[in-house]
Amino acid sequence: MKQPSVNIKNKRATFDYELMDTYTAGIVLTGTEIKSIRLGKASLVDTFCYFAKGELWVKNMHIAEYFYGSYNNHTARRDRKLLLNKKELEKIQRGMKDPGFTTVPVRLFINEKGLAKLVVALAKGKKQYDKRESIKEKDDRRDMARMFKR
């Protein structure tokens, strides 16, 4: 039986940051958390990553409580550990030491094996004029698409 595809995106990440390198990481979850994600009840708004004791953690990721979960339901916003190779962790940590760089979650999905994966990106914050420029480019692309439709 094929599971419905779950693809939850952090739309603010591409607007607020210039994404450099992306990495696909596993997430340490409880049973009710993965069930909620499979139902699409998760959000990456205001989510960020940080290092603690050489491990990468995601903070402020909202996974709604599972409706059918009883007393052993999870906390909606808790810190979750990300699973990456040692080399990838070292690359991300080196990149975050540069001024202006951070690590942001971009996309949450379920792979073909049924495991939840989080795509994190090493990113540099955009300035206000860069954001205006990207809005203008999007508007220009929309206008061109409208003109070609006619």
UniProtKB/Swiss-Prot annotation:
**Cellular location(s):** Cytoplasm
What broad class describes the main subcellular location of this protein? cytoplasm
InterPro entries per record = SmpB, SsrA-bd_prot, SsrA-bd_prot_CS
- Gene Ontology CC: cytosol
CDD domains listed in its UniProt record: SmpB (cd09294)
Q: Which Gene3D superfamilies match?
A: 2.40.280.10
SUPFAM superfamilies per the UniProt record, alphabetical: Small protein B (SmpB)
For this UniProt record, the keywords arranged alphabetically read as follows: Cytoplasm, RNA-binding
Q: Which GO terms describe its biological process?
A: trans-translation
GO terms assigned for molecular function: RNA binding
Please, which domain of life does this record's source organism belong to? Bacteria
| Function in brief | Required for rescue of stalled ribosomes mediated by trans-translation. Binds to transfer-messenger RNA (tmRNA), required for stable association of tmRNA with ribosomes. tmRNA and SmpB together mimic tRNA shape, replacing the anticodon stem-loop with SmpB. tmRNA is encoded by the ssrA gene; the 2 termini fold to resemble tRNA(Ala) and it encodes a 'tag peptide', a short internal open reading frame. During trans-translation Ala-aminoacylated tmRNA acts like a tRNA, entering the A-site of stalled ribosomes, displacing the stalled mRNA.
What's this protein's family per the entry? Belongs to the SmpB family.
Kindly provide the name given to this protein in its UniProt entry. Answer: SsrA-binding protein
Tell me which species this is from.
Bacteroides thetaiotaomicron (strain ATCC 29148 / DSM 2079 / JCM 5827 / CCUG 10774 / NCTC 10582 / VPI-5482 / E50)
Organism lineage string: Bacteria, Pseudomonadati, Bacteroidota, Bacteroidia, Bacteroidales
Q: Encoded by which gene?
A: smpB
